Amino acid sequence: MNEVLCGSLAERRRLKIIEAAERCVMKTGLHRLTLRDIAREQGGSLGNIYNYFANKEEIVEAIVERETDRFIAIAVQGGKAQGEGTLGERLREHMTSFVDAYLDSDGARVAVSIAAEAMINERVRDIIARANQRLYEVISNDVINNRQNSWPIPKAKMQAQLALSRSLLEGLRVTAIFNPGIDRKELRAVAIDRLVHGILADLSASKGVTVEELSRWP
């Protein structure tokens, strides 16, 4: 078996373990989850899990990294999009992708369970902190290095703005979970509006124009 095939097979097996762990978290939460639970969910052996992960925290880190990669992909791809319409229209389409991703019910339950564990588990808290820092670094560097971008915003301020936008999305997850009777269609629409307006407000201030003027830019 060649190295490429071996690597692909190993990655598929690793992914199956991560997905089994996510299903376990959705069922019973993270705090009492054991590797034996994950092996049972996967239909494999405990020894097979140890071939890929030394402990539960390493699996949690893999779950967090996968979510972070997903968020970065949406952000970077949206930043490179040069579709038709105004800046405001393209930004709205971009923010819609974020909101829909964060309103995914399964992903929300896993993310909230991990966040709850981070409150009492310092290692999990460090995993989330490192993932967040990587997220802000990648996105802010992408914006700064994009030759088509001319927003004169200092990197530290940009990262603070990213953190606040992310906090709205994280809060959206919690709201959807703990307010099951809320109109999700309205919640989605309001979240998109708030994100679009907030980002346009930050950018318009750096350009010395109004939000309305900036939203009409090509």
Where are these regions (language model features)?
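Helix-turn-helix
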Residues: 16, 20-58, 62
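Secondary-structure edge/capping motif, primarily at the C-terminal ends of alpha-helices
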Residues: 79-82, 119, 176-180
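C-terminal peripheral helix-coil segments that are non-catalytic and often amphipathic
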Residues: 1-2, 137, 141-145, 168-218
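Amphipathic alpha-helical packing segments from all-alpha helical-bundle domains
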Residues: 89, 103-112, 122-149, 160, ...
